[in-house]
């Protein structure tokens, strides 16, 4: 009989968001009249920017002509999009990133998992706790961990606790590690890292020959001009980092799918025989074999993000969601709750009241206020006693959700 990948059997009961969906579905079946407001999963709600829609319509029309038709595109992405990304997202900030170091994909979630394809077994992996679950689960699936313990932590991973005590920014590990997952602005806590903090990580990685996997999916929400948007704003990062970016949250591409990963040329790892190997070549080979590229139509839409009109519309979208975050912060603070995040990220991180556990607070809000959020314990053991609310919803729904919670 065919054998299964036993690593999947080590995964905890369910990925966080499907478990939320299961509970919400059961509640809705029992309470069909309830008008739920969803502030849980980080899915956007506002329409795509007009500039992107128009660009995609033009691309669709072109596909209907012999001269404008596009079949398989470059697995790495079309040159015109890669050049726009390199110039406007990186070179404009002083980062030495070239277009051929940009790999366009259908999602940073996919890329942050698939990057393990080019990294060998035996690497010591460090993740924050709490953490975006994909970083942990993808390592479990790839056989890079042992079993989960009583608290849900997996053997073989180095957990770096983050809390209010360290401003939700992990301390440099005391033990040597090889792979370091960093996410700033942080999901789920909404914390950001200063230039000095990122420099400390780059210095550590360079001195220990480690690799930083830097998730910058929420960089567009940073409000302080002193806070770096990219790890490559830090000197030396080209020698030790890969960065993941997405159009999902800033431009509303969650349903159209477009993202990119930055792999600098000259970034190297070690083969089993001790030989130094360039990671750019491995990732290029991996993408050429396992990925057929993002749709021409979608890439034209992504390119429009960098137009003058597109930039203005994206800025308006980001401002809208950040105003939602501000409303959530203000209203919950007025209730005496301890609130974090929501200033440079679309997530508000809440200390649950009265010693309530995370899932208990989830059920409380679901049943009493018909509001759906995300239990902090779903992001790791150190997230127990916290709760995440997302600013991704309409202004009407955010205001209504706050009114319901305040009435409890």
Curated annotation (Swiss-Prot):
Gene Ontology process terms (BP): lysine biosynthetic process via diaminopimelate, diaminopimelate-aminotransferase pathway
Keywords associated with the record: Aminotransferase, Pyridoxal phosphate, Transferase
GO molecular function, one term: L,L-diaminopimelate aminotransferase activity
Chain residues that bind pyridoxal 5'-phosphate: 72, 108-109, 132, 187, 218, 246-248, 257, 292
Domain of life the protein comes from: Bacteria
Reaction catalysis annotation: (2S,6S)-2,6-diaminopimelate + 2-oxoglutarate = (S)-2,3,4,5-tetrahydrodipicolinate + L-glutamate + H2O + H(+)
Catalytic class of the enzyme: transferase
Cofactors required: pyridoxal 5'-phosphate
UniProt: substrate binding residues: 15, 42, 109, 132, 187, 292, 388
Functional pathway: Amino-acid biosynthesis; L-lysine biosynthesis via DAP pathway; LL-2,6-diaminopimelate from (S)-tetrahydrodipicolinate (aminotransferase route): step 1/1
EC number annotated for this UniProt entry: 2.6.1.83
PTM sites of type N6-(pyridoxal phosphate)lysine: 249
Pfam families linked to this entry: Aminotran_1_2 (PF00155)
Similarity-based family: Belongs to the class-I pyridoxal-phosphate-dependent aminotransferase family. LL-diaminopimelate aminotransferase subfamily.
NCBIfam families membership: DAPAT_plant (TIGR03542)
Subunit and interaction comment: Homodimer.
Function: Involved in the synthesis of meso-diaminopimelate (m-DAP or DL-DAP), required for both lysine and peptidoglycan biosynthesis. Catalyzes the direct conversion of tetrahydrodipicolinate to LL-diaminopimelate.
Name used for this protein in its record: LL-diaminopimelate aminotransferase
Source species of the chain: Synechococcus sp. (strain CC9902)
């Amino acid at each position: 009989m065919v054998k299964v990948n036993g690593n999947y059997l080590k995964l905890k009961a369910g990925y966080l968001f499907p478990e939320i969906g299961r509970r919400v579905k059961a509640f809705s079946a029992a309470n069909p009249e309830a008008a739920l407001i969803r502030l849980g999963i980080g899915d956007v709600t506002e329409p795509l920017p007009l500039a992107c829609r128009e660009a995609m319509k033009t691309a669709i029309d072109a596909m209907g002509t012999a001269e404008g038709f596009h079949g398989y595109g470059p697995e790495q992405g079309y040159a015109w999009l890669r050049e726009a990304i390199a110039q406007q997202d990186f070179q404009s900030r002083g980062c030495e990133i070239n277009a051929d170091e940009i790999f366009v994909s259908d999602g940073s979630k996919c890329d942050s998992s698939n990057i393990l394809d080019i990294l060998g077994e035996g690497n010591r992996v460090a993740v924050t706790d709490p953490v975006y679950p994909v970083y942990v689960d993808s390592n479990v699936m790839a056989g890079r961990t042992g079993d989960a313990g009583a608290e849900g932590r997996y053997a073989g991973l180095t957990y770096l606790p983050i809390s209010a005590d360290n401003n939700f920014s992990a301390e440099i590990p005391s033990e040597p590690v090889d792979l370091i997952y960093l996410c700033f602005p942080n999901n789920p806590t909404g914390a950001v890292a200063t230039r000095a903090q990122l420099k400390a990580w780059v210095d550590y990685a360079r001195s220990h020959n480690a690799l930083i996997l830097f998730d910058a999916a929420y960089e567009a929400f940073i409000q302080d001009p002193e806070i770096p948007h990219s790890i490559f704003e830090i000197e030396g990062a080209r020698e030790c980092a890969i960065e993941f970016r997405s159009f999902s949250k800033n431009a509303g591409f969650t349903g159209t799918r477009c993202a990119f990963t930055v792999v600098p040329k000259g970034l190297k790892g070690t083969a089993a025989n001790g030989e130094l190997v360039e990671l750019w070549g491995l990732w290029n080979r991996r993408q050429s074999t396992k990925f057929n590229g993002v749709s021409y139509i979608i890439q034209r839409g992504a390119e429009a993000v960098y137009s003058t009109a597109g930039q203005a519309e994206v800025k308006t979208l980001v401002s809208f969601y950040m105003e939602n975050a501000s409303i959530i912060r203000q209203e919950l603070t007025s209730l005496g709750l301890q609130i974090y995040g929501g200033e440079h990220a679309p997530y508000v991180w809440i200390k649950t009241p009265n010693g309530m556990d995370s899932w208990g607070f989830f059920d409380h809000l679901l049943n009493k206020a018909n509001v759906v959020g995300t239990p902090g314990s779903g992001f790791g053991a150190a997230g127990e006693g916290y709760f995440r609310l997302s600013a991704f919803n309409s202004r009407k729904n955010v205001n209504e959700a706050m009114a319901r919670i305040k009435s409890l």
